[in-house]
Amino acid sequence: MEQEDDKQYSREAVFAGRRVSVVGSDARSRGRVPGYASSSLYRESGIISARQLALLQRMLPRLRLEQLFRCEWLQQRLARGLALGREEVRQILLCAAQDDDGWCSELGDRVNLAVPQSMIDWVLLPVYGWWESLLDQAIPGWRLSLVELETQSRQLRVKSEFWSRVAELEPEQAREELARVAKCQARTQEQVAELAGKLETASALAKSAWPNWQRGMATLLASGGLAGFEPIPEVLECLWQPLCRLDDDVGAADAVQAWLHERNLCQAQDHFYWQS
């Protein structure tokens, strides 16, 4: 196992042009928001800051930007709630400069698994989500839809605030638009509640199947060990063996990466290592 350092290196005007866009349900049904609307999903989720987005829009051609928003690497960070840092932005710009439409496949992260939070973000939570999907294959889709519905809900609030502000200037149009927004908000909240209920039921099933999951997380954060998770589901045994050998087996981190990559839980260019 390679021993190395893990080196990490105003709000915009809401009503500019008096145009407020809302992500449509047709886009959400495809599991991805097209074009520049995709930037809204990453921005609203806190994955890309306003400053980072402005830099990327200035430095990248439109095609490259759209490829970035569609790439698995960035969607992986969205699913895990991992914001871009300076090093990630630098990597994007370097890879995008290549004369190759497959440049997104060169994106990856360096992860020190000796850091408990990195172990949680990059291994345990993705693995738990994958394992949950074995209980019900619809779970990943429910989670993605919930994120997008929550983004749409925030955008609807923005639109409602806008029309409330201009009601005195354009009362009739404002009244119509506010009624339309209220109807959309009610429908969105119904969908959010339905998905949340499904996920809560799935979570209860998962807890009964792996009762020591929560205890294991607490133990890991307190002492750095994985023993609190045991006994683990049988399907995870091939992963758990190298995970428990990370601090004394030079090949364990590569075995973890290979297991995750086979199940599309990490990128080919992700590099896991252990440095305590």
Curated annotation (Swiss-Prot):
Disruption phenotype: Absence of ExsD leads to transcription of the type III secretion system (T3SS) regulon derepression. It holds the Pfam family ExsD_M. One of its GO terms (biological process) is cellular response to calcium ion. Disulfide bonds: none annotated. Changing residue 59 to R: Complete loss of trimer formation. It comes from the Bacteria. Can form homotrimer. Interacts with ExsA; this interaction inhibits ExsA activity. Interacts with ExsC; this interaction dissociates the ExsD-ExsA complex. Negative regulator of the type III secretion system regulon. Acts by disrupting transcriptional activator ExsA self-association and DNA-binding activity in absence of inducing signals. Upon host cell contact, this interaction is disrupted by the anti-antiactivator protein ExsC leading to ExsA activation. This is Transcriptional antiactivator ExsD. The gene is exsD.
